[in-house]
Amino acid sequence: MDPPAVVAESVSSLTIADAFIAAGESSAPTPPRPALPRRFICSFPDCSANYSKAWKLDAHLCKHTGERPFVCDYEGCGKAFIRDYHLSRHILTHTGEKPFVCAANGCDQKFNTKSNLKKHFERKHENQQKQYICSFEDCKKTFKKHQQLKIHQCQHTNEPLFKCTQEGCGKHFASPSKLKRHAKAHEGYVCQKGCSFVAKTWTELLKHVRETHKEEILCEVCRKTFKRKDYLKQHMKTHAPERDVCRCPREGCGRTYTTVFNLQSHILSFHEESRPFVCEHAGCGKTFAMKQSLTRHAVVHDPDKKKMKLKVKKSREKRSLASHLSGYIPPKRKQGQGLSLCQNGESPNCVEDKMLSTVAVLTLG
């Protein structure tokens, strides 16, 4: 083997790696060094975070930008998430699906995520005897979770467990999740649409984008525009070559509608001549059969007025679709009173059943 001086001379004219290769040529061949694991490094200033997976870096970058690219498209929801996995887990709250079943003997509990199933199994079936005991004198209280013990011990020390580190704040919280939620009040969510708006919550940012940066959705058939995708989806039914429609059951009418609401409105206003909802705007006086129609009309006089969301009314005696459309209202029965039969032996509900056959669902060619 060459003396160390040879190595020094080689270093002066070559790179360090080449020098050591040259110095070791006369010795036994060395095995190749294992490749270092690839790291994905955050490019934001003053941030040294790095990850072994690209998706982990993508999720981390969202913390800098405030972006949540995975949005729930269920009507009326609009929640957004950093990872597609979080969105998939959230969608299960809409569907009610719980695909993960506990395999422990005698336990049939179901969960919407694998992690929740794992936590349940560890807590209920594996660590039944494991207890976290308070070490303070004359206490000895026990807890199933370590975090519960830590929160309890704050009562002894009178020190906040999770404290906000923002200068001038000093608020403290009982759990890390509540502290994390509070931290967003300091950081905020920056609007990415070219304005300087900063929201305190993600929901507030979504509301700002919807109201300030409205993006009209265009119908490719008739060029009509809509504010929401579900409005466009409903509108596209009018262009479909075949569609389900509701036909007016009144004799000699034959009018058809694409929604039950419009059919009900037609029967009340045209056949029953019932339009009890009057516009109170000065000089207007228009009347409507349905309260929702009046609410929509009111926007004509006050464009800045938001359309009211329909509230779910308290449950009341159910009526069939036929009774709504025909105008027939079955008589109320006292509690515990049995059904009285018609002269032909049929119950009063048979009138509704017969009416139902007149509400036709047609297919337009």
Curated annotation (Swiss-Prot):
One of the GO BP terms on file: ribosomal large subunit biogenesis
Xref: SUPFAM superfamilies: beta-beta-alpha zinc fingers
GO cellular component: nucleoplasm; nucleus
Tissue-wise expression: Ubiquitous.
The keyword NADP belongs to this UniProt entry's keyword annotation: no
Gene3D superfamilies xrefs: Classic Zinc Finger (3.30.160.60)
ZnF segments: C2H2-type: 40-64, 70-94, 100-125, 132-154, 162-186, 189-213, 217-239, 246-271, 277-301
Keywords from the named record: DNA-binding, Metal-binding, Nucleus, Repeat, Ribosome biogenesis, RNA-binding, Transcription, Transcription regulation, Zinc, Zinc-finger
Pfam families named among the record's database cross-references: TFIIIA_zf-C2H2 (PF22110), zf-C2H2 (PF00096)
Record carries keyword Transcription: yes
Record localization: Nucleus
One annotated GO molecular function: zinc ion binding
Entry-linked PANTHER family: TRANSCRIPTION FACTOR IIIA (PTHR46179:SF1), ZINC FINGER PROTEIN (PTHR46179)
Role: Involved in ribosomal large subunit biogenesis. Binds the approximately 50 base pairs internal control region (ICR) of 5S ribosomal RNA genes. It is required for their RNA polymerase III-dependent transcription and may also maintain the transcription of other genes. Also binds the transcribed 5S RNA's.
Protein name: Transcription factor IIIA
Organism name: Homo sapiens (Human)
Lineage, opening ranks: Eukaryota, Metazoa, Chordata, Craniata, Vertebrata
